[in-house]
C-alpha cells in the first residue's frame, strides 16, 4: 500500500491483486501525479469527465467528486479501481466503469489518458474519442518520459489535432492536445491474418497480445494439444483464442471456456470462433474474468494456459501463479493443466510443488510445455467459486 498526497486530498492506494511484495511496487506513478497537478478543475462544467487506462484507479479516486467515466481494456484494472475506492471510503457508484468495447459518453469536457503499452490500443481509443469529443474538450495525457515517442505525438495529431508535450518531471511527461476538424481515413476494427497450416482467418482487436502474427509460444503449444478430451476445457488467458480454436477442432465432444481479463481478447476469441467454426458456438462460453474466479470448483477436465509473466510494465509471475492455483481448484480429480512457458521461468518446480507432479511434454531452446494432473487426494481448496486463497510462500 502507498500514499499519494495531492495537497487537497490524500489517497491510500494498493496494487491489485494484493501481493506479498506489494510494498515494493506502488499503485501510482509520477505520471498520475503530474496529470493531477495540471488538470484545471475549474473548467469542469458538469459535462462528462473521461479517464483512460487508469491501471489501479488512481485517477478515478482523485477525480471521484466529478463522477468520471473510466475506460479500460483490463478487468483487473476495473477491480483495482473498485478496490481503491473502497479503501478510501469513496462512493463506488460515482465512477462509471467502461470496457474498451463500450461506447463513450458524448461531448466530454475533460479527457485524461494514461498512455497504454500498446500503440494500437491508443489509436483505437483516440479514434473512439474523435467520434464523441466537442471543440472545447480538454485532452491531457501522461506517461513515463521513455514511453512518449514521436509516434505517440503523431498519433494524437493525426487523429485529434494540434499536440504538444511538456518538459519532463520526475521522469514523466504530459501531452496536451486540441480538438480540430481534420480529415481522417477509416481504419479496420481488427487486424486479420491466416493461421498457418489451417484454413482459418484470425481476427485481432487492438489490444490483443501478438496482434499481427501468431505468438511463437502459442505456435509451439498448438503442436501437441490433446485429442478426444470429453468434459469441459478452459483456455485460460485465451488472448485471441487460437489455442482454444484448435482444441475445439480436436475435441468434438468437449465444451470450451475462453477466459481472459482483457475485454478485447475475449471479443477476439468470440469473433474467431464465430467466423471460423460457427457450428461449434453452442459448445463455447466466453468470459471476462480475473483468472477462473466465477468458475465452479472441480468442473473442468483440462486447462490450457499460456501465462503472462508481466503485469503491464512490471515483470512478475504472480498472475501466472494465480492462474495455476485457480486451475487446481477448478479441475476435477484426474483433470490436467497444460501450460507453455519460457524455459527460464522455472514453472516445472512450481507446478510440481502445487500439484505434486509435473511432466515435460516437449521443449525447445526457448519454451517448455508442461503437464500436471490433479490428484484425487489433493488437499481441499475450499468451497464456492472464488479464486483460490493461497500465497506463493505456501509452496
Swiss-Prot record:
So what does this thing catalyse? guanosine(1835) in 23S rRNA + S-adenosyl-L-methionine = N(2)-methylguanosine(1835) in 23S rRNA + S-adenosyl-L-homocysteine + H(+)
Name by which UniProt lists this protein: Ribosomal RNA large subunit methyltransferase G
Q: Which UniProt keywords apply?
A: Cytoplasm, Methyltransferase, rRNA processing, S-adenosyl-L-methionine, Transferase
Instruction: Write down the species.
Output: Yersinia pestis (strain Pestoides F)
List the HAMAP family. 23SrRNA_methyltr_G
Hey, which family's this protein in?
Belongs to the methyltransferase superfamily. RlmG family.
| Location relative to the cell | Cytoplasm
Single GO MF descriptor: 23S rRNA (guanine(1835)-N(2))-methyltransferase activity
- One of the record's GO cellular component terms: cytoplasm
> What does this gene product do?
Specifically methylates the guanine in position 1835 (m2G1835) of 23S rRNA.
Principal EC category: transferase
Concerning Pfam families, the annotation shows:
MTS (PF05175)
Amino acid at each position: 500500500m502507498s500514499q499519494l498526497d495531492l495537497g487537497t486530498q490524500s489517497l491510500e492506494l494498493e496494487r491489485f491483486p494484493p501481493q506479498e511484495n506489494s510494498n515494493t511496487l506502488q499503485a501510482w506513478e509520477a505520471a498520475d501525479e503530474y496529470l493531477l497537478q495540471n488538470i484545471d478543475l475549474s473548467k469542469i462544467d458538469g459535462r462528462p469527465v473521461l479517464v483512460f487506462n487508469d491501471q489501479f484507479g488512481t485517477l478515478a479516486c482523485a477525480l471521484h467528486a466529478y463522477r468520471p467515466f473510466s475506460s479500460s481494456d483490463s478487468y483487473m484494472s476495473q477491480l483495482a479501481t473498485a478496490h481503491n475506492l473502497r479503501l478510501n471510503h469513496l462512493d463506488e457508484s460515482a465512477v462509471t466503469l467502461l470496457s474498451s468495447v463500450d461506447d463513450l459518453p458524448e461531448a466530454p469536457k475533460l479527457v485524461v489518458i494514461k498512455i497504454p503499452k500498446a500503440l494500437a490500443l491508443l489509436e483505437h481509443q483516440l479514434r473512439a474519442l474523435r467520434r464523441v469529443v466537442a471543440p472545447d474538450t480538454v485532452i491531457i495525457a501522461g506517461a513515463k518520459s521513455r514511453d512518449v515517442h514521436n509516434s505517440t505525438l503523431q498519433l494524437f495529431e493525426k487523429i485529434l489535432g494540434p499536440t504538444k508535450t511538456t518538459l519532463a518531471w520526475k521522469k514523466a511527461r504530459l501531452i496536451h492536445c486540441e480538438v480540430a476538424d481534420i480529415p481522417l481515413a477509416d481504419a479496420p476494427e481488427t487486424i486479420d491474418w491466416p493461421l498457418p497450416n489451417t484454413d482459418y482467418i484470425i481476427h485481432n482487436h487492438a489490444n490483443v497480445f501478438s496482434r499481427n502474427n501468431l505468438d511463437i509460444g502459442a505456435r509451439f503449444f498448438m503442436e501437441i494439444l490433446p485429442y478426444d478430451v470429453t468434459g469441459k476445457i478452459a483456455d485460460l488467458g485465451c488472448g485471441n483464442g487460437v489455442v482454444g480454436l484448435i482444441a475445439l477442432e480436436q475435441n468434438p465432444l468437449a465444451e470450451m471456456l475462453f477466459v481472459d481479463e482483457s475485454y478485447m481478447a475475449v471479443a477476439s476469441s468470440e469473433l474467431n470462433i464465430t467466423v471460423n467454426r460457427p457450428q461449434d458456438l453452442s459448445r463455447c462460453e466466453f468470459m471476462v474474468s480475473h483468472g477462473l474466479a466465477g468458475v465452479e470448483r472441480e468442473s473442468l477436465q483440462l486447462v490450457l494456459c499460456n501465462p503472462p509473466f508481466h503485469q503491464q510494465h512490471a515483470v512478475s509471475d504472480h498472475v501466472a501463479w494465480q492462474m495455476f492455483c485457480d486451475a487446481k481448484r477448478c479441475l476435477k480429480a484426474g483433470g490436467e493443466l497444460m501450460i507453455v512457458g519460457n524455459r527460464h521461468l522455472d514453472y516445472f518446480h512450481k507446478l510440481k510443488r502445487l500439484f505434486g507432479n509435473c511432466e515435460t511434454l516437449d521443449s525447445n531452446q526457448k519454451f517448455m510445455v508442461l503437464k500436471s494432473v490433479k490428484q484425487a487426494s489433493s488437499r481441499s481448496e475450499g468451497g464456492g467459486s472464488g479464486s483460490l486463497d493461497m500465497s506463493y510462500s505456501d509452496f
